[in-house]
């Protein structure tokens, strides 16, 4: 009898504790994000979907204790090279937070960024990649295309992009190259580019973050992309420089002659592998292993000129600085699988 009373009393205490003392975390009012876009040395933007924007206040806190309130989601008047903590409140209650590192103005500053490709599957592997990316605290994340499978339908953006990469996108903008799965429907690629605020037309553009420059060329090196690259590389750039196409460059590709000696590396995806290759004197890094998976082995064969090749899931960390550029492939379990250091140009 006494044991029964004690059991009932304990259950009652636990019920009261869980219901009234612990309280409820409540539902997340944001259906997308918040996530960072448009990051420069003095400005940043945080976007979201869900609550009425009139009820949301975005505040960025600098290391020195000063704060800036966003207008229309945009922070201006920021200090360069500083990590800001941002908080989103809804009706005065903090509901989301993150941070971003404004671009440095020091040409000798080192910049860390991530690279992924063929990732937009919304599966457990992509979530693992997203967690790994967040752990390296990148300034931005470059994608090598195929951001959404099988098509870049707006209804799939959250499943394939914004939810798996939620944590890293709360601190680093996604610099998107479009792949053939993204552009199969023309509106799909444009929708992704608009959502992440890609510069220009969202297909061919140049992104600059401090001393780092990335030239984004879309699916492959057609005549229009080669012409864009010639114009871009005709302009001097003293810092680390990169190029990205969705489909990897092959020996004899006319783009290789344009970029030889002018880039630290050329990134690509499409092949669902990670590969490191030297092609006509240019370091090529294929990052097609970030979520979708290898598929049919018949169509996922190692490239003949590959120095290193694997179908294991992973992402790339790039540390670019005045002493050179270190490019590392990290697998979904957090192990370093490949590393190469590129001396300054």
For each predicted feature, which ranges?
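Acidic, histidine-bearing metal-coordination/catalytic regions of metal-dependent phosphoesterases
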Residues: 1-115, 120, 131-137, 312-345
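Extended active-site neighborhood of metal-dependent phosphoesterases/phosphodiesterases
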Residues: 35, 67, 85-101, 154-240, ...
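Active-site metal-binding loops of divalent metal-dependent hydrolases
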Residues: 115-120, 145-148, 180-181, 219-220, ...
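Short, motif-level signal for alpha-helix interfacial/capping segments enriched in acidic residues
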Residues: 124-125, 247-261
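Receiver (REC) domain switch-region micro-motif
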Residues: 141, 241-243, 266
């Amino acid at each position: 009898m006494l044991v029964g009373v004690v059991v009932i009393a304990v259950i009652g205490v636990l019920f009261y504790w869980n219901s009234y003392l612990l309280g409820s975390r409540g539902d997340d009012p944001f259906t997308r994000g918040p996530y960072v876009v448009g990051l420069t040395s003095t400005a940043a933007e945080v976007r979201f979907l869900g609550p009425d924007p009139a009820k949301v206040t975005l505040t960025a806190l600098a290391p020195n204790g000063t704060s800036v309130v966003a207008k229309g989601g945009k922070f201006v008047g920021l200090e360069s090279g500083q990590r800001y903590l941002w908080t989103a409140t809804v009706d005065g209650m903090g509901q989301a937070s993150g941070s971003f590192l404004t671009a440095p103005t020091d040409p000798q500053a080192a910049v860390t960024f991530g690279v992924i490709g063929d990732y937009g599957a919304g599966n457990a592997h992509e979530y693992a990649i997203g967690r790994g990316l967040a752990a390296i605290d990148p300034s931005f994340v470059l994608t090598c295309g195929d951001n959404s499978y099988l098509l870049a339908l707006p209804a799939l953006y959250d499943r394939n992009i914004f939810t798996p990469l939620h944590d890293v996108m709360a601190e680093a903008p996604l610099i998107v190259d479009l792949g053939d799965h993204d552009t199969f429907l023309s509106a799909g690629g444009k929708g992704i580019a608009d959502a992440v605020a890609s510069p220009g037309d969202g297909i061919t553009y140049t992104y600059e973050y401090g001393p780092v420059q990335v030239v984004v060329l879309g699916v492959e090196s057609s005549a229009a992309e080669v012409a864009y690259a010639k114009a871009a590389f005709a302009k001097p750039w003293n810092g680390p420089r990169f190029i990205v196409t969705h489909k990897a460059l092959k020996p004899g590709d006319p783009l290789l002659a344009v970029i030889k000696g002018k880039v630290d590396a050329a990134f690509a995806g499409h092949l669902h592998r990670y590969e490191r290759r030297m092609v006509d004197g240019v370091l090529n890094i294929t990052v097609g292993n970030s979520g979708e998976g290898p598929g049919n082995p018949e169509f996922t064969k190692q490239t003949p000129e590959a120095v290193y090749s694997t179908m294991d899931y992973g992402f790339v960390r790039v540390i670019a600085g005045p002493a050179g550029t270190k490019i590392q492939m990290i697998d979904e379990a957090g192990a370093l699988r490949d590393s190469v250091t590129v001396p300054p140009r």
